[in-house]
């Protein structure tokens, strides 16, 4: 521990002992002080050390709990199809007219890899996009980069910088919903809607996945961390971080029927083979072992007839209840809460049995931190130290006895709580655990608000146990939490750190709530291209507008009806989003409303097909789990539509619909009246804002503790939940932000802004790895993206293939206005140079198909010149544009990133690029 950490720990301990009323903490008073002093001065005779019975046979034993590494990729619920629909794009392109109107076939030089110099634009706001007054009929001009020219960037809001000149306005003004609205203390968790689903969404009670183990009728958050408690065999782990829990159910080395508690240290990780194609040769995956029986909280009454059920499943918690038999009052209740400091078991009239497959080395009866609480120090054969606190309901000493290397027995008829915690911090850590023993969290809540561009949210917990008013909780925070704590919360950090499975080290924090702050939120992001330096760019240069209007007719010729009415909500949503973005680009950025009029009308009709629920696989309201699902999976194949019927990927699928609706409604506000209810239904299903909605659970996909969404729904998994596409996760947050703005729902808009802020932080910490990433293993970071991040492992791959452009690209698409915010420039630069530069193993110039367009659109975030040259090149090959994107939008997107560019004639550009032609 460094000197600063030691000082903070000492200061916090002193504060706990001396303060009368602590901000954010319950009154601890002299009772805790006296207890800690007594514990420190108790004579050694007050402690009793128990050793396992010795025998020559025992000396030969080796730990029975062996680590198991399940390397295979579970494909259930995941399609091997590409993440965008496949269309013959060439069929709608007549002659592939050249955007630059140049003569003959000319080749654009291969874009060069960006260098460090591109980073200078991030802090130099003197480079801007040139505004022009010629919008209707621009000359043959095109953007080229120059030195800072003193031109002015069109801004969504006027800048206060002295000396700037207002840009010349061209064409139609930005749509109303594209202008940021000042907010002051806006609650981000107000209801989206309260009524039932639309009448044409029929209810079904025959969901293919039966709810057999959850007691209660409230909506169930299908994608939460505790799904292993109720799905399938009920034996897969639940990852509360830093601990993992799993019902033994008669399995494992000890054949126990209790709850396994484990914690994995970094030396126990297993690594995949190195990838020699990537600089640094990073390993392809890392995985935590399962089946480690560090401790098992059980009882002698548990056996073959025992059952486990789940009660009160909520956003941050659930209760796992193991009964000796169905209908029995003898039971152990485990409040399972994200970040809990101890694993707590609440016993009712049972004989406790604490087991270990790692083997007990010794158990020390270590006195009482407070009256009625009995403490044991547990030393295991893997050199780890755990603490056990027993709080009998009657206050009597339980007198646990170590009967073997694997069994620690308690008294018959025990009612009360037993808590266990791993202590890596020696005496100081032990004092923190002592101080919070006897209480435990039973549920979590979140609240939040937005003021200006600063979001604040609070995670708080309801607690139970002994002396709850005078005893503070101890909870574990993830790295992204610690980085965003306000000063009061930061002051309650301890020196206890435990490794999580896939998110670095967690930190124990004292108190019942944390307040976290996200500053500099991208509140001005709208539908137009956006950059971290210039904000929203509503007006492009004449050259960019010219390119857009030249490209648009080709793509507007596509059959919108056919491309949007598919047998997949995912593909259909992507197509609707694609055409909505195309219409917006032509209408607002190309300043040509008439050109997109027919396509806009067709788009609205195509969207209406889904609102009327007449698509190939209509939606149904699932009354079992309570949500809106595709009926495609009711035919016996839950893998249909990427597992939508079983709640896979709802934030991906529905996010595209929501984003498309936001654009349509902004361009035609009269459209909202007939469609708002249906779109809000999708928001409530995938990202509901309240916990008391009788029709949908709170925040199905987004995990407000982990700081990102989980894509896996009702599929049993030994590695827990997972997510493959961070960019589609951020797309959902962007979509609800823009839909909220379009319909005037300030709470939804603010929530989307705060989610984007949290995602920007969590992705930087866990998924999009820069060279100095502190949370992922050092031998994995050079992969730059995690690939699929599970709760128990990280695998640099995808469910649909292992091509490098797939693995990296699924974290890029869709490239939308928010992408520059969530994909930091330095990360993009490092990834490009390592993966896709001309000298790398997979040069973007040699990638085939739609992934090529994805890569070059992503390149615009750091090298817009090279990206522009790619998309504006003569005889552009439309096979490079995937079925969920358009060249037209990419041109606008790149131009929006191209601040600091000036206008030059086409002929001058041709001469500079050496493409030939007369001067």
Which role does the model predict for each range below?
Residues 682-686:
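Extended, hydrophobic alpha-helical segments in both membrane/secreted and soluble proteins
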Residues 2, 6, 15, 20-651, ...:
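Ser/Thr/Asn(+Pro)-rich, low-complexity disordered segments
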Residues 735-738:
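"A position-specific structural signal for the A-helix of alpha-solenoid helical repeats
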Residues 722:
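Substrate-binding surface in catalytic domains of secreted glycosidases
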Residues 597-601, 673-681, 750:
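Short sequence/structural elements of tandem HEAT/ARM alpha-solenoid repeats
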Residues 566-587, 644-671, 675-679, 725-733:
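Aromatic-rich carbohydrate-recognition surfaces in CAZymes
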């Amino acid at each position: 521990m460094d000197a600063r950490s030691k000082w903070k720990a000492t200061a916090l301990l002193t504060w706990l002992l001396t303060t009368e009323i602590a901000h954010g903490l319950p009154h601890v008073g002299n009772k805790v002080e006296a207890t800690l002093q007594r514990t420190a001065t108790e004579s050694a005779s007050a402690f009793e050390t128990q050793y396992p019975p010795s025998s020559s046979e025992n000396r030969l034993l080796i730990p029975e709990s062996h680590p198991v590494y399940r390397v295979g990729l579970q494909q259930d619920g995941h399609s091997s199809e590409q993440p965008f629909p496949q269309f013959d794009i060439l069929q709608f392109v007549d002659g592939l007219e050249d955007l630059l109107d140049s003569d003959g076939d000319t080749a654009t030089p291969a874009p060069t890899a960006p260098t460090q110099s591109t980073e200078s634009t991030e802090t130099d706001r003197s480079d801007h996009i040139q505004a022009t007054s010629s919008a209707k009929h621009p000359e043959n001009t095109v953007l080229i980069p120059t030195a800072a020219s003193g031109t002015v960037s069109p801004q969504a809001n006027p800048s206060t910088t002295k000396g700037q000149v207002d840009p010349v306005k061209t064409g139609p003004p930005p749509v109303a919903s594209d202008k940021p609205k000042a907010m002051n203390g806006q609650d981000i968790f107000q209801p989206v809607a309260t009524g039932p689903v639309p009448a044409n969404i029929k209810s079904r009670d025959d969901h293919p996945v039966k709810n057999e183990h959850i007691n209660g009728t409230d909506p169930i958050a299908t994608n939460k961390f505790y799904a292993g408690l109720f799905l399938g065999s009920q034996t897969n782990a639940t990852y509360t971080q830093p601990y993992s829990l799993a019902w033994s159910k008669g399995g494992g080395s000890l054949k126990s029927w209790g709850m396994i508690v484990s914690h994995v240290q970094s030396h126990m990780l297993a690594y995949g083979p190195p990838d020699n194609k990537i600089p640094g040769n990073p390993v392809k995956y890392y995985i935590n072992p399962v089946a480690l029986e560090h401790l098992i909280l059980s009882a002698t009454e548990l056996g073959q007839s025992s059952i486990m059920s789940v009660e009160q499943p909520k956003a941050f918690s659930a209760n796992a209840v193991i009964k000796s038999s169905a209908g029995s009052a003898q039971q152990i209740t485990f409040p399972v809460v994200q970040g809990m400091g101890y694993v707590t078991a609440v016993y009712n009239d049972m004989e406790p049995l604490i087991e270990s497959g790692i083997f007990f080395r010794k158990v020390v009866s270590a006195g009482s931190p407070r009256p009625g609480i009995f403490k044991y120090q547990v030393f295991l054969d893997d050199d780890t130290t755990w603490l056990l606190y027993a709080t009998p309901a009657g206050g009597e000493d339980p007198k646990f006895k170590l009967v073997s290397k694997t069994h620690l027995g308690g008294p018959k008829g025990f009612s009360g709580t037993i808590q266990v915690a791993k202590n890596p911090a020696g005496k100081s850590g032990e004092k923190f655990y002592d101080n919070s023993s006897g209480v435990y969290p039973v549920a979590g809540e979140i609240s939040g608000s937005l003021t200006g561009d600063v979001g604040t949210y609070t995670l708080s917990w309801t607690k139970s146990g002994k002396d709850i008013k005078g005893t503070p909780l101890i909870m574990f925070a993830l790295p992204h939490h610690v980085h965003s704590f306000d000063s009061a919360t930061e002051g309650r950090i301890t020196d206890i750190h435990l490794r999580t499975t896939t998110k670095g080290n967690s930190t124990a924090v004292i108190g019942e709530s944390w307040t976290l702050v996200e500053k500099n939120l991208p509140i001005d992001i709208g539908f137009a291209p956006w950059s971290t330096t210039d904000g929203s760019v509503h007006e492009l240069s004449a050259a960019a507008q010219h390119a857009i209007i030249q490209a648009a007719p080709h793509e507007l010729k596509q059959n919108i009806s056919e491309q949007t009415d598919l047998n997949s909500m995912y593909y259909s949503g992507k197509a609707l989003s694609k055409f909505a973005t195309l219409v917006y680009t032509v209408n607002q950025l190309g300043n040509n409303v008439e050109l997109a009029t027919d396509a806009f009308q067709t788009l609205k009709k195509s969207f209406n097909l889904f609102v009327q629920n007449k698509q190939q696989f209509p939606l149904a309201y699932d009354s079992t789990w309570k949500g809106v699902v595709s009926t495609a999976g009711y035919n016996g194949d839950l893998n249909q539509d990427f597992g939508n019927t079983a709640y896979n990927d709802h934030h991906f699928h529905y996010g595209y619909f929501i984003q498309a609706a936001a654009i349509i409604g902004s361009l035609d506000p009269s459209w909202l009246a007939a469609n708002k209810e249906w779109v809000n239904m999708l928001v409530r299903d995938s990202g509901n804002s309240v916990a008391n909605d009788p029709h949908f659970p709170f925040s199905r996909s987004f995990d407000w503790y982990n700081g990102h969404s989980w894509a896996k729904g009702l599929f049993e998994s030994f590695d827990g939940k997972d997510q493959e596409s961070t960019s589609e996760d951020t797309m959902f947050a962007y979509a609800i932000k823009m839909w909220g703005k379009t319909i005037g729902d300030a709470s939804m808009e603010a929530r989307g802004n705060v989610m984007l802020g949290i995602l920007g932080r969590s992705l930087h910490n866990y998924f999009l790895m820069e060279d100095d990433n502190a949370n992922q293993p050092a031998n994995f970071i050079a992969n730059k993206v995690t690939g699929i991040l599970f709760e128990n492992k990280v695998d640099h791959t995808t469910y649909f293939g292992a091509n490098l452009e797939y693995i990296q690209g699924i974290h890029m698409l869709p490239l939308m206005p928010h992408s520059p915010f969530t994909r930091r420039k330095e990360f993009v630069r490092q990834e490009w140079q390592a993966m896709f530069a001309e000298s790398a193993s997979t040069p973007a110039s040699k990638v085939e198909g739609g992934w090529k367009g994805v890569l070059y659109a992503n390149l615009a975030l750091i090298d817009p010149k090279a990206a522009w040259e790619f998309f504006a090149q003569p005889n552009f090959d439309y096979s490079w544009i995937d079925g969920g994107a358009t060249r037209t939008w990419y041109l606008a997107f790149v131009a929006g990133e191209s601040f600091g560019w000036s206008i030059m004639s086409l002929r001058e550009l041709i001469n500079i690029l050496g493409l030939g032609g007369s001067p």
